Amino acid sequence: MNKHFDVIVIGGGHAGVEAALASARLNKKTALINLYKDRIAAMPCNPSVGGPAKGIVVREIDALGGEMAKAADKTALQTKLLNSSRGPGVWALRVQSDKEEYSKYMQKIVEEQINLQLIESIATDLIIENNTVTGVLLKDGEILKSKCVVLTTGTYLKSEILTGHEKFSSGPNEEPTSNGISESLKKSGVELFRFKTGTPPRIYKNSVDLSKAIKEPGTDAKLAFSFSTNEYTPIEKQELCYLIHSSSETKKIIEDNLTKSAMYSGKVESIGPRYCPSFEDKIVRFSSKETHQIFIEPESISGDAWYIQGFSTSMPTDVQLLMIRSLPGFEKAEVKTWAYAIEYDCVNPMQLNPSLEIKNINNLFTAGQINGTSGYEEAAGQGLIAGINASRKIDGLDPLILRRDEAYIGVMIDDLINKGVWEPYRLLTSRAEHRLLLRNDNAEHRLKEKGYEIGLIKQAEYNEYLKYTEEINNAIKELEEIRFTPKSELAIKLKELGQADLSHGYSGIEILKIPTVDIEVMIPYISSLQNLKNNQLQSIVIETRFAGYVKTERKTVERLVKLEKKKIPSDIDYDKVENLATEARQKLKKVKPLNIGQASRITGVNPADIQMLLFYLKNNYATEQK
């Protein structure tokens, strides 16, 4: 086995896979350490990819040259466009994934990737010399040397499983946990804290009756995450999900047994996810509600179990069985896998640079749940950035840092390093102040150029993107030039459908600006709209109808970007900046922002503090500020 690498990635989950692939594709000799090769990119919790904000992250990963979007498209059981009745800033794609096939797909990609070696082992310790990571110690005593290390350990750092009053050391699915890395980080002055998450039970399909459940089909449209996907599963071949509601009996069972839950017995000392609470937590927090939604989802086309979305719990197994059998259609349910909660160590992400490198340990990057986030998509996005930046650091290049107006990935990383996390962080559209610019349809326009410049987007795909963009521009040009009279076929059709009544001549673009007009009706009459992808049509409609809002938003961004260009020297002494609030001074010292824009987003730093900082920089670092 080779013992010298450019980059070592510890952990083969969604963050680790993206980090390792990015590094290897950028011509770095890369090792990916994971205990079992058949657990690469496993889905230990929900068998799905995407959702609000998260689905846009998957598109961003694809635009930068990552793999998650392709894997999700290839292994989708159902595809659904969410929030389609609302504004385009919150549209999002979600797929129900075949978790077995997803993992197999990623395993194949990893094993076939040039420059990438998959090592089946456990990393038990980091080798850190003079505040610089130089390698990794494996469980068999083998030492691997490297220039950079990316930690993507998920929920495996000093993890403990909790069910009822039982608590024991283990990773998800009873896999080994890792304690040594936590101790290494602590010795190097890295602040750690404990978070909690959980997973629901899995129920044998043949033991439940879903005849009275509400069917939840996918969306009947050609939808995909990846720019390169051209094959779509027709709606009639997609798998169904189902919706049921818990009963009043379910609520009573939980209320009667609440002290048996690990959450409410004092066993859990860590903080759980606000946006994915345990079922007993829902009963306590929303005590006035008698019932709660529960989604029944397939895990695999070849699988024999349902995933019970929204029903995670840390109750003992005897109480879990009572809870499950109180659900409509689950009176005779048989459990394949019991629910459990899991506690694990995280790094305080305010100790990270925007590149995701730990500030006080050179060449050590972290990504995924170790940074306090939740979700496969958030992890994959961070993993991609960490892998890219580890590679770029070796080459002596500036890191890739995405701004908040460029990507949801940028919003997430900016939130992590400047605001910190006090509970598992979930990406939401409400976290993005520029969400009209960060849409489901325009990830390619925002990031494909960057992916190409970095080297992850190959020439052939880049040429396809240029063609894609040209087709949109040609269509908009034709819409601006072509005119339709009230007696034209299109005008008559629109009137018949009740979408518009043209009283005089209109250009195609003026017609498209009418909110009630469906662009699909216009396609037969506009040659350049024909054969366009769904995303291209979406972009044309949104850019046309929201042009004024988009223009205003871009002007706002231009002003903010100017603040990003006002650099803060690394040797600044914040104690010498007069009239700074005490909290602001403490936070600035801790975060060490690179520029005024970043400083302005730190929790506890107010506009008055920024003015004092600008005044100090002008008087003491005038040359650097020009």
UniProtKB/Swiss-Prot annotation:
Gene Ontology cellular-component annotations: cytosol
Key words, A-Z: Cytoplasm, FAD, Flavoprotein, NAD, tRNA processing
Location, primary (coarse class): cytoplasm
Residues engaged in binding FAD: 11-16
Molecular function as annotated in GO: flavin adenine dinucleotide binding
Gene3D superfamilies, alphabetized: FAD/NAD(P)-binding domain (3.50.50.60), GidA associated domain, C-terminal subdomain (1.10.150.570), tRNA uridine 5-carboxymethylaminomethyl modification enzyme MnmG/GidA (1.10.10.1800)
Cofactor(s) required, per the database record: FAD
Matches recorded under SUPFAM superfamilies: FAD/NAD(P)-binding domain
The keyword Cell inner membrane is assigned to this record: no
Compartments, as annotated in UniProt: Cytoplasm
Entry-linked Pfam families: GIDA, GIDA_C_1st, SAM_GIDA_C
Bridged cysteine pairs (disulfide): none
InterPro entries the record matches: FAD/NAD-bd_sf, GIDA_C_N, MnmG, MnmG-rel, MnmG-rel_CS, MnmG_C, MnmG_C_subdom, MnmG_C_subdom_sf
A biological process term (GO) from this entry: tRNA wobble uridine modification
Family assignment from sequence similarity: Belongs to the MnmG family.
Biological function: NAD-binding protein involved in the addition of a carboxymethylaminomethyl (cmnm) group at the wobble position (U34) of certain tRNAs, forming tRNA-cmnm(5)s(2)U34.
Record's subunit section: Homodimer. Heterotetramer of two MnmE and two MnmG subunits.
Protein name: tRNA uridine 5-carboxymethylaminomethyl modification enzyme MnmG
Annotated source species: Mesoplasma florum (strain ATCC 33453 / NBRC 100688 / NCTC 11704 / L1) (Acholeplasma florum)
Gene: mnmG
